[in-house]
Amino acid sequence: AILSRLVVDERTLVSDVCHRLLDLAWEDYRVKCLNEEPRGSTGRGITPAYLDEVGQWQITYADFLGGANYFARKLTQRAERAIRTIQHVCQVSEETWKSFFTKLTEAELRANAEAIELGILKKEDVDFLQFMGEKPFTLNIARIIEVYWNAGKSLSKNIGEVRELILKEMLAGHTIIGEFGQAYWLDKRHGYSPNVTASHTYTPEIFESAGIPVQRVHTFGVAKAYDTKVGTHTFITEMDGSHPLAIKLKQIEFGTSTGRQRMVGWYDAIEKGDALRYGGFQDLMINKLDALTYSGAWNGELLICTAYQDSAGKLYKHVPRNEVIRKSLKPVYTAYPGWSEDISGARKFADLPVAARRYVAAMVKSLLEVAYADQTWPKDLPNLRYLGVGPLPSQIIKDVPPALELIKLA
């Protein structure tokens, strides 16, 4: 059913095991050769894949529509470049080289545990040891070519020109939905280097990626009712690991594609407000409000970060662009009472406990105060269109009052 509706643009980049090995190798180089903190890479090969695009070494899905020999030549060249880089530039040891394949296998087994349990995938499908050569710093290139060529050819009927498809649908009056899998603060230019991805992660990129003219779009800002990060980020609002809410949230917070444990923290209105101020969005969605319901000894107090403060007492109402400064800051919190009621069945805003409604209002008000600072607020404010109270599509509250009315509850 999915394949009948799927179109992969012919210019889509092909990322493979070479990129993933390079990702791990550069992380090893950063730590062992440069004596720096790890970047916290997912190990998915994203940055090396984009480096190939910038360097004009890319392999695209269009290559699956050509001959096998041409594809094999390009992938062989990529593999040889990767091996030389890993061995001679990154100076990876033989022991570490071998560990990469085990590490990638373990990561995929963890990320695909549910699919394997359901029989959708087999364990051998995610076994990266099959790509390791017999000698150190060699690859089973024939096997790599076979696996990736067969995978690409299986999608050959789904490869097409997405930009024409989008333009056709737009001319027919249909709505096009584009989704960014990462946040504004992971944008390669606007985020916190080196803890960023290799692409642009907010609205302007939709035109570049889709290949369509710049035009008016309606952007939704999407956030959780608390904060999470994964990797080695400086996390100003990170919760103490022993806090009852942190313990609870860590049971549900794992990377979608990697299965990695996420760090959890209090809602950071400074980051959200600056994402609105500099990134821009017309409406807001907040999910996982239900995860904040308290029980047990904890009294349910919730914190919202409304400013940062340095050691001299100076307050910051925006995220500093200087990472040295940002790393030195502490959060300034405003506390709000929590609630113990189960809100997963609420479908109307009025169904929520008073404390939950006030907390929601405070999240919206605090980010608006950051975004618009001392300027005159615009007439049309971003409204909270959807409020998630559970993982199911039906567990969404859609009647939240308009922003001007909502923030009066804070």
Model-found features: residue ranges?
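Non-transmembrane, aqueous-exposed alpha-helical and coiled segments at domain scale
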Residues: 1-410
